[in-house]
């Protein structure tokens, strides 16, 4: 961060969702609707808000010219705020040992003008690849020195499924499991006519549990008004 150039409080930070994989980095841009592997970019002087998680092994996200190191961990989200004040191409890496492909787990960060960033986004949108749950499950398989890859669109809610470890069909998300516990666990499930754990192990029953929890939450919100 520049010592002489204060941040403009009226500028909306650029959100970048970061997923550490074996052994590559996935970057998702919810505002722009794109995603990239082993490459990301941001406009100069625009604050960046990183949200980070991991798929299996803890890693450490580090761009020495941008900001300090921060860990990315499975089932958890960490956050980092940063800004780049000078155009250029910078090296990013995993600074925490994470297995066989650790040494090649690097990426490029491009600090661009506003026009250059818009052009970079448009280039990604022309790649024609779609990042949905199926293509994500292929991407997440371990690979070393993965080439830069760009996705023109991203399935809604994908990052939240990654964070809650439920990208696979039929797998209940962590936040739904926690909601069940908060509602009373097995006693609550029996009250609404479901038995744990067997009834939650199918796609249909998992969806039913979530629907019941959503209904309970909406009723509670109405009661509080």
Where are these regions (language model features)?
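Non-transmembrane, membrane-proximal soluble domains of secreted or membrane proteins
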Residues: 1-225
């Amino acid at each position: 961060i520049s010592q002489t150039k204060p941040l403009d409080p009226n500028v909306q930070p650029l959100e970048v969702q970061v997923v550490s994989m074996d052994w590559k980095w996935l970057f998702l841009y919810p505002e722009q609707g794109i995603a990239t592997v082993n490459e990301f970019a941001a406009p100069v002087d625009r604050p960046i808000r990183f949200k980070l998680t991991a798929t299996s092994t803890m890693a450490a996200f580090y761009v020495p010219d941008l900001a300090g190191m921060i860990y990315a961990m499975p089932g958890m989200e960490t956050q980092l705020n940063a800004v780049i004040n000078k155009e250029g191409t910078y090296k990013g890496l995993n600074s925490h040992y994470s297995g066989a492909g650790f040494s090649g787990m690097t990426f490029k960060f491009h600090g661009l003008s506003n026009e250059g960033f818009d052009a970079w986004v448009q280039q990604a949108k022309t790649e024609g690849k779609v990042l949905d749950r199926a293509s994500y499950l292929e991407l997440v398989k371990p690979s070393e020195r993965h080439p830069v890859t760009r996705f023109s669109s991203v399935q809604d809610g994908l990052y939240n499924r990654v964070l809650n470890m439920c990208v696979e069909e039929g797998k209940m998300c962590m936040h739904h499991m926690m909601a069940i516990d908060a509602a009373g666990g097995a006693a609550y499930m029996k009250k609404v006519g479901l038995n744990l754990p067997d009834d939650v192990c199918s796609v249909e029953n998992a969806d039913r549990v979530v629907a019941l929890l959503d209904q309970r939450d909406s009723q509670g919100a109405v009661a509080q008004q």
